[in-house]
Amino acid sequence: ISFHTDIRSKKIEELKNNNKLSMLFYDHGKKIQLKISGNAEIHNKNDQSRKAWDQSRSFSKKCYIVENAPGTPSDKAVSGYADEYEYDLPSDEILENGYNNFTLVDIHISSIEWLYLHRDGHRRALFTFENDVLIKKGWLTP
């Protein structure tokens, strides 16, 4: 699993101090919850981040040209874009400046906890990984 974020975000600082993380997903229709745990690998200004950047759409790249870091307090609701880019897509040259802030985070999964919610009884399982290979699986009491 991978995600993109701004190098200036607080989560990057936290992951640099401790690269362990958990993510929780829930599908209401299927009544399935997934808790995924693993270790984050941060890519900024390297081959992996460049490839991800080059594959991103222009509107996605626009997120990384904001002047202030994500989470910066403001007295009013703001997008963070300069006025001239508020409603328009900047040129490719301007968008390229966002690459400095763009970061790819790869998650190396260590475990997946699967939970199926049902009124007649829940079901729960645990899958454990090592070096991206499934090494153990089994049922748990919900």
Give the location of each predicted region:
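A short mixed-secondary-structure module that forms the rim of ligand-binding clefts
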Residues: 1-31
